[in-house]
Amino acid sequence: MFRDVLKTLPQYLIPKHGITALAGYFADVKNPRLKNFLIRNFIRKFDVDMSEALIEDPKSYDCFNDFFIRHLKPECRPLSQSDVICPVDGCISEIGKIERGQLLQAKGKYYSVQELLACDGQLAEQFVQGQFATLYLSPKDYHRVHMPIDAELVSMTYIPGALFSVQPATTRVVPKLFARNERLAIFFKTKIGPMVMVMVGATIVGAIGTSWHGDVKRSKKLERFDYSEQFSDKIISQGSEMGYFKLGSTVVLLFANGEKIQWDKELLAGSKIQLGKPMAIIT
């Protein structure tokens, strides 16, 4: 724990938003020499497997961000026939029941559904006995997010906040981390009731985006988007792309009807998992 504190303490002191803005600027630079340098060194540092990428040649990307949100060859991530599939490549931080409206962040640390979603008590009440899974995307992972189940898009809320790192050490130290950081809460209807996918921002995450909106503009104000009427393509099928991170972060998946979700017993905190793998069955 002491080592985690030492790693985390500087984050309270550095200008996280300024550093993130600067990183975002360089990640969009299209100068061939600079972007190729950034991409080449990133691949080397994080041992990125470019054979899985739809475009294998690193020099073919216009900028670092285009490389970072690269598409994969479909055959590299076949979709299982499970009722609920994993929406990302990543690692399970925590998974299980929402207990009296509280989600487990790390050992001994909790945060509430209402805090995470920045919503009223009536909406949070729907998830008070639900199920959740927190999925951490490391820098080397594929950074597009897909649908875990067929769903109808209802609304989206951009919630401004801090930009702490979401690496495991930070989650063990910073209280209510996912309810403090900038995030995008996306609300869906499914055949088993309400579902929310929360895309959590972090230090040097240049942008969070969705397939229907594009990059969501960073702001100091909470903003809600209602898709109940004006949006035509509201039904998004299982496995379809729904969003992306420009640099890595975390997805928190919430189901309101906890009695209907039975997580795969092999999924434990710390488990690695890939897009399309089985996550849960509907009972």
UniProtKB/Swiss-Prot annotation:
Chief location of this protein within or outside the cell: membrane
Transmembrane segments: none
Active-site residue list: D89 (charge relay system), H146 (charge relay system), S249 (charge relay system), S249 (schiff-base intermediate with substrate)
Annotated metabolic or biological route of this protein: Phospholipid metabolism; phosphatidylethanolamine biosynthesis; phosphatidylethanolamine from CDP-diacylglycerol: step 2/2
Subcellular location: Cell membrane
InterPro entries: PS_Dcarbxylase, PSD-B, PSD_type1_pro
Site, as annotated: Cleavage (non-hydrolytic): G248, S249
Source organism superkingdom: Bacteria
GO BP, sorted A to Z: phosphatidylethanolamine biosynthetic process
GO cellular component, one term: plasma membrane
Stated name of the protein: Phosphatidylserine decarboxylase proenzyme
